[in-house]
Amino acid sequence: MTEVKAPPEIFDARLLALRRARAAKRQDSFLMQRALSDAADRLLDVNRNFGKVLILGTPSIEAELVSKLPKEKFAEIICCETLEQLPQDNDFDLTLSLLRLQSENELPGAIIQLRQNLKPDGLFIAAMFGGDTLTELRQVFYKTDEDIMGGLAPHIYPMANYTQAAGLLSRAGLNQPVVDTDRFTVSYGKLETLISDLRDLGETNVLKERPDTVLTQNYWAQFKKNYQKMFSREDGKLNCSFEILWLTGWSPHKSQQKPLKPGSANIHLGDALKTMKS
């Protein structure tokens, strides 16, 4: 009998929990505020209220989201800070996760778990950082590692791209899967502000294979020089890219519209285009 191997642990779960606990005591991240506003807009576009809602995140997220929506949108909310705290119930109308899943060791399993919490025709929505996030920071780490240490060390963890995110939804068995992206660039007056924004989310380096020594003042001095040289604007501010992937899907239900089989359309593409032009 073949032994099933556990997925590799990319993240230090203990350190991640500690960082997130500290982040909960800090000011709300502007990145989380952006995700919350976008989530509220998406929920307002859904023409239904949700009786029972499961949120993967901190209680502050629950309060912020509720404040942006009509009172009748949610009847009952259960908020869990970790996957281990998720209930066994499968009767939720909505499961929602904001900027948490990118740090899960077993991302496919996490989405499957949240999908299993849904009742038929329940809605899954998640926002997580995508592969273009912190691309400038990543490249500056590469350059500085080479300059100072003569080799590369792990600093920023890998993140899913658009195609991978779509595959995760299909693998979880969600119907009508949709992935869209929110890409934006932030200009920072100094590097310390960028680091502070990441700490506000608890998203600094929690890789299990992270360097076991503290980066020196000499390293950070060279890092700042490299960042300024490689990714600064004319006014001296530092550019940093972010990408938030939005994943949406529905728990299967017989009432849902099914995609047509190839060749089953009852109108030709040419006729459709003529109709559009007329």
Task: Please state what every model-predicted region is.
Residues P108-L123:
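A short glycine-rich, Lys/Arg-flanked "PGG" loop and its adjoining helix->strand segment in the class I
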Residues M1-N49:
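Class I SAM-dependent methyltransferase Rossmann-like catalytic core
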Residues A127-L191, L201-V214:
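Conserved catalytic/acceptor-binding region of the Class I
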Residues Q85-T95:
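A short acidic, Gly/Pro-enriched loop at the edge of an enzyme's catalytic core
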Residues L98-S103:
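Short catalytic micro-motifs in class I SAM-dependent methyltransferases
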Residues A40, L44, A172, G189-S278:
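C-terminal lobe and adjacent flexible extensions of AdoMet/dcAdoMet transferase-like proteins
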Residues A75-P87:
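Adenosine-cofactor binding site in Rossmann-like domains, unifying the SAM/SAH pocket
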